[in-house]
Amino acid sequence: MTSLRFDLANVGFAEGERYERARPGYPPGAIAALCAACGITPGRTVLDLAAGTGKLTRELVACGAQVMAVEPVAGMREQLAAGLPGIQIVQGTAERIGLDDASVDVVMVGQAFHWFDGPAALQEIHRVLVPGGAIGLVWNVMDRRVGWVERVQELIHRHRGPNPWYAGHAWRAAFTAQCGFAELQHRVVTNAQPVDVAGLIDRVASISFIATLPDEERSVLMNEVRHIVAEELPGQARFAIPYVTDIFWSHRMG
């Protein structure tokens, strides 16, 4: 992660409590598919890289794996430690993981690879993986095929600027024939997050570049989100945010 990206993430994701509250978990089908593809079984050593508040970490622990977590943002590490006091948590980044060579069987990354310096991160992931070890990537993405979601996403996109984002797919450029990993595989699982208006507002506010907006600008944006809900979902106290969960995996070569 470049210093500029780290600074943005460190500020934008500082409110670990909001992130934990607002972001959805991963659907069981996505976790099962990733565990099968990456060979995650009881006793295997798995690194959750850029673990955040531990949403993916908890799923990996439930699979019976020996899980450790690397996370650069202090607020995220605090939430992670509170929820999973028994696991090893290391302050580090994807480009400087801080573990020994060939020390883990699988590296998992949830909602984060697009933040990394891709080539440098893959080189470091290659280093800490055992020969033939696996990398798994997962993202929960709001389903823009739904009309009201598309309107909310357009509002969000106005404020994105040069910030890294998954849907732009620039992150995939790191997976070249020379990157040390086999061809990236992909699968899609659908998901939904039940919320009320306050929950949707929290979800939007948990986005790094939204969290760093000036208070007045952020307040205007949130009122626009409320207006969309009132227009598109009239009278619905609770509703579901539809998601597409994208999972990717590959294996270390050499």
Where on the chain are the PLM-derived regions?
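Conserved class I S-adenosyl-L-methionine
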Residues: 1-41, 55
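A short, conserved alpha-helix within the catalytic core of class I
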Residues: 116-124
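Conserved Class I S-adenosyl-L-methionine
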Residues: 173-254
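A short acidic, Gly/Pro-enriched loop at the edge of an enzyme's catalytic core
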Residues: 95-106
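A short beta-strand submotif of the Rossmann-like class I SAM-dependent methyltransferase core
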Residues: 109-110, 118
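Conserved catalytic/acceptor-binding region of the Class I
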Residues: 126-195
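Class I SAM-dependent methyltransferase SAM/SAH-binding core
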Residues: 45-47, 53-96
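Nucleotide donor/acceptor-binding cores
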Residues: 43-44, 102
